[in-house]
């Protein structure tokens, strides 16, 4: 079970699991529609479009804006439990296509609940398309225009690093679970948008961290999620990992972190996330 949950979490961080096309189902939306949202990015779009009051429940990654933290939680979007969702008596379930297998989809349809399933591409274009698809489907297109405009405005404020520092992303859940991000991940895309470059190019997705790989990559900066940094005991704990002190990042104590949902969701706050990352790596 531990391996399954880890694999699920890393799959969310991989670009390879996503597609560029968007697919929608008629949402049949009304002011009284009760929605269960199964993605942090989707929930942010709904809230930004003025539909927060319609959200009856969310997955555990939906914690922004603050009001969503008190919404009933139905588990992780990579391990969807139909019974828990149906107990909230939703009219509409919105999620990512990759999280729904045919049996699960059939279960919701048999229960008479409408589904709106979309693909998500972790890019600037993909973020805008996600906003457009959701707001058009829910008949709040003007709100979508505003959200897309905000994304553009915030991205325009980014002051990318001029020297393209080598950034190594470490995904950690305590000292026993430490993975390093290779190519083809959404964090790599974020690093690139912020003006940096991925320190690891030899492999795709995520692999266990080794001292040899660390020294070879020799990153200028080590990046973690806030939760990952905390799980390792802060910067001091990261510095104790074998190989860290031999890197430029370790020697110069360049260990940074960001909120995982902000950095990795590629929702309406994408521009804000890239601004923050650019400031940290510059």
Which residues make up each language-model segment?
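Bacterial N-terminal signal peptides that target proteins for export
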Residues: 1-6
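Bacterial signal peptide processing site
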Residues: 19-22
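Basic- and aromatic-lined ligand-binding clefts that recognize polyanionic substrates
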Residues: 28-46, 142-194
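A short, structured surface patch at a secondary-structure boundary
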Residues: 34-88, 92-97
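Extracytoplasmic ligand-binding site segments that recognize negatively charged/polar headgroups
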Residues: 119-132, 166-186, 230-233
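Structured C-terminal subdomain patch of bacterial secreted/periplasmic proteins
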Residues: 126-136, 145-146, 159, 226-282
